[in-house]
Amino acid sequence: MSDEWMQAWQPTIDVVGRDFSGGLESTAIDTIELGAVRKFLEAVELDCPLHYDAEVAKAHGYRNVLAPISGVSQTWLDAALWRPGLGSRYPSNHPHVDVPRERVTEAPSPPTPPTTVGFATDVEIEYFEPPVVGDRLTVRGRKLVSCTPRETRVGRGAFMVWEREVINQDGARVALIRNGGYSYVPFESSDEASSPRPPRPPAP
């Protein structure tokens, strides 16, 4: 059957909506600091008192100085490359040393057919409780939101979207982060594609 490769993704489709985090969470190494917010503003020259004046922020209904939401996905969630108690991440001065990583329990994976290549496709962030100075954020969950098998110009595979939740120290939801990606088996040649596109004409 020509659609056997699509049917191979049915077990993955069947588990859409399930969490595959294994209960793992990652908490930022630091609380959000006023100095860190200042440096964040400095790079983009953002002059808004909500981000540096606590009285102004509270007068507008916020708990404290607002941290720029663009830092939610990475900066305010930084778990640190090294912490006291860990061994050196650079045990050798060799320029190509394999930097050891902290061992953590591996999260489970959904049932998927074999693929050999993949790439990120999109990132979507939905914001809720604004993060403020003094908050310490945690990211948790790894829910499979969707799985869409599709043949593209590069191969056959599926587009999958994963969702993680960001909360603050009080358990309030700060954001939902959805990451999309395409996992596939590439065509060995363009002749394998069901509907190969003709080559583009040469530029004049």
Labelled PLM ranges:
Residues S2-D122, S190-P204:
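Hot-dog-fold acyl-thioester-processing enzymes
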Residues M1-E25, F119-P204:
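HotDog/MaoC-like acyl-thioester-processing domains
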